[in-house]
Amino acid sequence: MRKIPFSPPDLSQAEIDEVIKVLKSGWITTGPETKLFESRIAERCHTEKAVCLSSQTSCAELTLRILGIGPGDEVIVPAYTYTATASIIYHVGAKPVMIDCKSGSFEMDYDKMEAAINHNTKVIIPVDLAGVVCDYDRIFEAVERKKSVFNPRNELQEKFGRVIVMADGAHAFGAQWHGKMCGEIADFTNFSFHAVKNMTTAEGGAAVHRSHDGIDEEDMYKRYMLLSLHGQTKDAYQKNKVASWEYDVVDTQYKCNMTDVLAAIGVAQLERYDQMLDRRHQLIKLYNEEFKDLPVQVLNHCDENHRSSGHLYFVRFIGKDADYRNKFYNMMADHGVMCNVHFKPLPLLSAYSKRGFKITDYPNAYNMHKNQLTLPMNSTITDDEAWYVIETFKQCMKTLK
């Protein structure tokens, strides 16, 4: 029986060579390779700076802390997302406000999102699910209309003068929307380079932000550096470079820096990224063509206004329930095709249900989840393997009527 894994990393000799170069350099923790990777991320995203850390989660949490989000504040998130989007809100002591999906869509109901904005709201975290960029025109229209209720608690928030939009771009590195790159659309964007992502450093993430009047780019970068390395004023590479051991610790902070070994993987991945992204879109086009006459709903990954990062290929079985989806998942696995489900809406998870969130309050999110399946679709899949996925999918549909 054939085996089609869900999402293996696409690694070549180039990544191996870059890692070996770093290992032989004598410097393997945060240093010149991480800084090189940051500069190339910023170049790709059309931003002044990028900060590379240990995960998207650490990038997002540190962004909230830099913005001064804390007790008494509210942060709006979709109910349909992974826990990392919302757990960071609890980490900083704020309150997550969950918004249901719009009927028939994986995105938030933007009317409900706008209605939820009040004087406690400080941040909205849209999620670019599967690498498809959200409707940021609608989101920014909402925060502009609600400017009068915005209640800034510090100087940085005052500079924005409205609710801040911080994108969860964990799936969306390389996506484009109305001629802009993901990373230059929202006020802040945080990416994931986890092993299953469409570009990887094994573990890691990056924070970027678009330029804003009154915000000093270098100062913002230094804030991330302090927060990510114990509040220490010099990292090990800086101390070694200037031959000065003296440093200060200005606050009790965190430890979530990226290492040069992991950054090396990312540097090599970026060189190949356009090719990998093109391959994903070739597969999306093939799947779309083969599934167009089947009773399934798929995401729109590309049109004249946007091109996704091609991270995940969702299908929804129209008119079916979770039992059907689960049987379909198992049948695909029996034929060696490993699929996945993205995601359980947050109120279905114990961490959130015990905090009072009820899935019955989010019926659209549940309806999107109950018959959703994610097919293997990545840049390592050959044409022959893709056709096997397609043929197996069609056979399972015939069997499970």
Task: List each language-model region with its residue ranges.
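N-terminal "arm"/small-domain region of PLP-dependent enzymes with the aminotransferase-like
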Residues: 1-27, 32, 248-250, 376
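Amphipathic, non-transmembrane alpha-helical secondary structure
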Residues: 17, 61, 110-118, 137, ...
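Phosphate-binding glycine-rich loop
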Residues: 27-74, 88-90, 98, 147-151
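PLP-dependent aminotransferase class I/II
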Residues: 34-39, 47-50, 123-127, 132-140, ...
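PLP-dependent aminotransferase-like
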Residues: 65-169, 176
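A short alpha/beta connector and helix-capping loop motif
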Residues: 107-113, 179-189, 393-394
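Conserved active-site segment immediately N-terminal to the catalytic lysine
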Residues: 153-200, 245-249
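Active-site PLP attachment segment
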Residues: 171, 184-234, 260
